[in-house]
């Protein structure tokens, strides 16, 4: 019997080749309970062998609070410890401002579109 994919509250997961594409479905990541759910769900994905390459698409998200940004940074750091790579795409202008303030692009590759991010996985690994 094949194992069914996990059901998530905040994420939609799709494999594109060997890349786990994670669409964050929430419009806002404002509250601590959302950050906790995001941490749990992204943690489940990023710890898997099949998610050695993970693309987090924030295109639907209009607002990210500081706690959720901390979660995203933690996911990148944990993935690196596992030898995995995380990239981001689709940041709206408001989310991009916050990402720039916390220095997300110093820890992970941030691309405008999913296609650009997927193409970047085929190139050399991101070096900090």
Residue locations for each model-derived region?
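Charged, low-complexity, helix/coiled-coil-prone segments
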Residues: 12-22, 55-67, 121
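Amphipathic alpha-helical interaction surfaces in cytosolic regulatory modules
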Residues: 28-108
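STAS-typified acidic loop motif
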Residues: 3-40
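Short, charged, intrinsically disordered terminal tails
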Residues: 116-128
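Residues that form or immediately flank small-molecule/cofactor binding pockets and catalytic motifs
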Residues: 18, 93, 115
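Short acidic-hydrophobic, aromatic-tinged amphipathic segments that line or gate anion-handling sites
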Residues: 108-117
